Amino acid sequence: SLDGVIQAPGGKDEDTEGDFTQGGWTFHYWHDEIGVLFTQVMSESDALLLGRKTWQTHGGAFEPMAEGDPFGDMMNAIPKYVVSTTLTDASAWRNSTLISGNVVEKVRALKAQPGKNILMDGSSALIHTLAQNDLIDEYHLLVYPIVLGGGKKVFADGTPLKLRLVEARPLPSGVVLTHYTVERPA
Protein backbone atom coordinates (compact mmCIF):
# COMPACT_ATOMS: atom_id res chain seq x y z
CA SER A 1 0.00 0.00 0.00
CA LEU A 2 1.05 3.64 -0.21
CA ASP A 3 1.67 3.58 3.54
CA GLY A 4 3.95 0.54 3.24
CA VAL A 5 1.57 -2.12 4.57
CA ILE A 6 2.15 -5.65 3.27
CA GLN A 7 -0.11 -7.53 5.70
CA ALA A 8 -2.77 -9.89 4.32
CA PRO A 9 -2.85 -8.74 0.70
CA GLY A 10 -4.51 -11.93 -0.51
CA GLY A 11 -7.45 -12.58 1.76
CA LYS A 12 -9.72 -11.25 4.50
CA ASP A 13 -8.57 -13.83 7.06
CA GLU A 14 -5.01 -14.31 5.78
CA ASP A 15 -3.38 -12.49 8.73
CA THR A 16 -5.54 -10.74 11.30
CA GLU A 17 -2.74 -10.24 13.84
CA GLY A 18 -2.97 -6.88 15.60
CA ASP A 19 -6.72 -6.77 14.82
CA PHE A 20 -5.97 -6.16 11.14
CA THR A 21 -9.29 -6.12 9.24
CA GLN A 22 -8.24 -4.95 5.77
CA GLY A 23 -7.20 -8.37 4.36
CA GLY A 24 -7.62 -8.94 0.63
CA TRP A 25 -6.90 -5.32 -0.26
CA THR A 26 -5.00 -6.11 -3.50
CA PHE A 27 -7.76 -7.92 -5.43
CA HIS A 28 -9.45 -4.81 -6.79
CA TYR A 29 -6.16 -3.73 -8.38
CA TRP A 30 -5.16 -6.96 -10.18
CA HIS A 31 -3.63 -6.51 -13.63
CA ASP A 32 -2.05 -9.17 -15.84
CA GLU A 33 1.26 -7.25 -15.71
CA ILE A 34 1.48 -8.18 -12.03
CA GLY A 35 1.43 -11.85 -13.00
CA VAL A 36 4.06 -11.19 -15.66
CA LEU A 37 6.27 -9.51 -13.03
CA PHE A 38 5.84 -12.42 -10.60
CA THR A 39 6.81 -14.89 -13.32
CA GLN A 40 9.81 -12.80 -14.41
CA VAL A 41 11.16 -12.37 -10.88
CA MET A 42 10.63 -16.08 -10.16
CA SER A 43 12.50 -17.07 -13.33
CA GLU A 44 15.47 -14.93 -12.20
CA SER A 45 15.58 -16.76 -8.85
CA ASP A 46 16.59 -20.24 -7.85
CA ALA A 47 15.29 -20.17 -4.26
CA LEU A 48 12.38 -18.71 -2.34
CA LEU A 49 12.80 -17.46 1.25
CA LEU A 50 9.66 -17.12 3.34
CA GLY A 51 8.56 -16.61 6.90
CA ARG A 52 6.30 -19.26 8.40
CA LYS A 53 2.95 -17.51 7.88
CA THR A 54 3.66 -16.65 4.24
CA TRP A 55 5.02 -20.17 3.63
CA GLN A 56 1.87 -21.73 5.10
CA THR A 57 -0.41 -19.44 3.08
CA HIS A 58 1.43 -20.04 -0.20
CA GLY A 59 1.87 -23.75 0.47
CA GLY A 60 -1.84 -24.11 1.18
CA ALA A 61 -2.58 -22.62 -2.23
CA PHE A 62 0.12 -24.19 -4.39
CA GLU A 63 0.93 -27.61 -2.87
CA PRO A 64 -2.47 -29.17 -3.68
CA MET A 65 -2.52 -27.65 -7.18
CA ALA A 66 -2.53 -30.17 -10.03
CA GLU A 67 0.43 -30.04 -12.40
CA GLY A 68 -0.05 -28.01 -15.55
CA ASP A 69 -0.47 -24.51 -14.14
CA PRO A 70 2.76 -22.76 -15.19
CA PHE A 71 3.04 -20.51 -12.14
CA GLY A 72 1.89 -23.20 -9.72
CA ASP A 73 4.42 -25.64 -11.19
CA MET A 74 7.15 -22.99 -10.79
CA MET A 75 6.18 -22.32 -7.16
CA ASN A 76 6.12 -26.02 -6.30
CA ALA A 77 9.42 -26.80 -8.06
CA ILE A 78 11.59 -23.97 -6.71
CA PRO A 79 13.57 -24.77 -3.54
CA LYS A 80 11.94 -23.01 -0.62
CA TYR A 81 13.47 -22.00 2.72
CA VAL A 82 10.99 -21.36 5.52
CA VAL A 83 12.20 -19.39 8.54
CA SER A 84 10.38 -20.37 11.70
CA THR A 85 10.85 -20.68 15.44
CA THR A 86 7.71 -22.83 15.80
CA LEU A 87 7.74 -25.33 12.91
CA THR A 88 9.56 -28.61 13.41
CA ASP A 89 9.05 -29.91 9.87
CA ALA A 90 8.75 -28.36 6.39
CA SER A 91 7.36 -31.36 4.51
CA ALA A 92 3.86 -29.84 4.07
CA TRP A 93 5.05 -28.11 0.88
CA ARG A 94 7.42 -29.96 -1.42
CA ASN A 95 11.02 -28.78 -1.90
CA SER A 96 10.98 -26.89 1.40
CA THR A 97 13.78 -26.67 3.97
CA LEU A 98 13.31 -25.39 7.50
CA ILE A 99 15.60 -22.65 8.83
CA SER A 100 15.44 -22.15 12.58
CA GLY A 101 17.92 -20.51 14.90
CA ASN A 102 20.61 -18.07 13.77
CA VAL A 103 18.64 -16.94 10.74
CA VAL A 104 21.10 -14.18 9.82
CA GLU A 105 24.07 -16.54 9.52
CA LYS A 106 22.04 -19.17 7.66
CA VAL A 107 20.74 -16.63 5.14
CA ARG A 108 24.23 -15.16 4.77
CA ALA A 109 25.48 -18.70 3.94
CA LEU A 110 22.65 -19.18 1.41
CA LYS A 111 23.55 -15.89 -0.27
CA ALA A 112 27.20 -16.97 -0.52
CA GLN A 113 26.28 -20.03 -2.58
CA PRO A 114 26.56 -19.78 -6.37
CA GLY A 115 23.35 -19.33 -8.31
CA LYS A 116 20.68 -16.84 -9.16
CA ASN A 117 18.68 -14.61 -6.83
CA ILE A 118 16.97 -15.63 -3.60
CA LEU A 119 13.44 -14.23 -3.71
CA MET A 120 11.48 -13.18 -0.63
CA ASP A 121 7.74 -12.66 -0.62
CA GLY A 122 5.81 -11.13 2.26
CA SER A 123 7.18 -12.07 5.67
CA SER A 124 7.51 -8.61 7.26
CA ALA A 125 9.41 -9.74 10.38
CA LEU A 126 11.92 -11.62 8.23
CA ILE A 127 12.34 -8.64 5.89
CA HIS A 128 13.04 -6.41 8.91
CA THR A 129 15.66 -8.82 10.29
CA LEU A 130 17.42 -9.17 6.95
CA ALA A 131 17.35 -5.41 6.25
CA GLN A 132 18.79 -4.66 9.70
CA ASN A 133 21.65 -7.05 8.88
CA ASP A 134 22.26 -5.71 5.34
CA LEU A 135 21.19 -8.95 3.66
CA ILE A 136 18.75 -7.52 1.11
CA ASP A 137 20.21 -6.33 -2.19
CA GLU A 138 17.07 -5.37 -4.14
CA TYR A 139 13.43 -4.54 -3.56
CA HIS A 140 10.74 -5.28 -6.15
CA LEU A 141 7.72 -3.50 -4.71
CA LEU A 142 4.17 -3.26 -5.97
CA VAL A 143 2.77 0.02 -4.65
CA TYR A 144 -1.02 -0.05 -4.54
CA PRO A 145 -3.06 3.19 -4.61
CA ILE A 146 -4.56 2.65 -1.19
CA VAL A 147 -3.72 3.80 2.34
CA LEU A 148 -4.63 1.12 4.89
CA GLY A 149 -3.85 3.17 7.99
CA GLY A 150 -2.10 0.39 9.88
CA GLY A 151 -0.72 -3.11 9.66
CA LYS A 152 2.59 -4.86 9.18
CA LYS A 153 4.92 -2.79 7.02
CA VAL A 154 7.70 -3.61 4.61
CA PHE A 155 10.15 -1.20 6.25
CA ALA A 156 10.76 -1.21 9.99
CA ASP A 157 10.99 1.99 11.99
CA GLY A 158 14.58 2.75 12.94
CA THR A 159 16.20 1.00 9.98
CA PRO A 160 17.32 3.68 7.50
CA LEU A 161 18.04 2.57 3.93
CA LYS A 162 19.35 4.37 0.89
CA LEU A 163 17.80 3.00 -2.27
CA ARG A 164 18.40 3.64 -5.95
CA LEU A 165 15.43 3.47 -8.31
CA VAL A 166 16.02 1.05 -11.18
CA GLU A 167 12.50 1.03 -12.60
CA ALA A 168 9.04 2.44 -11.94
CA ARG A 169 6.15 1.44 -14.17
CA PRO A 170 2.53 2.45 -13.56
CA LEU A 171 -0.24 0.02 -14.51
CA PRO A 172 -3.77 0.90 -15.66
CA SER A 173 -5.13 -0.31 -12.30
CA GLY A 174 -3.08 2.36 -10.49
CA VAL A 175 -0.49 -0.06 -9.10
CA VAL A 176 3.11 1.04 -9.65
CA LEU A 177 5.73 -1.65 -10.21
CA THR A 178 8.99 -0.49 -8.65
CA HIS A 179 12.48 -1.95 -8.51
CA TYR A 180 15.14 -0.54 -6.19
CA THR A 181 18.68 -1.58 -5.36
CA VAL A 182 20.21 -0.96 -1.95
CA GLU A 183 22.97 1.65 -2.01
CA ARG A 184 25.85 0.70 0.24
CA PRO A 185 28.72 2.93 1.33
CA ALA A 186 31.80 2.54 -0.87
Where are these regions (language model features)?
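Enzymes that bind and transform nitrogen-containing heteroaromatic metabolites
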Residues: 1-186
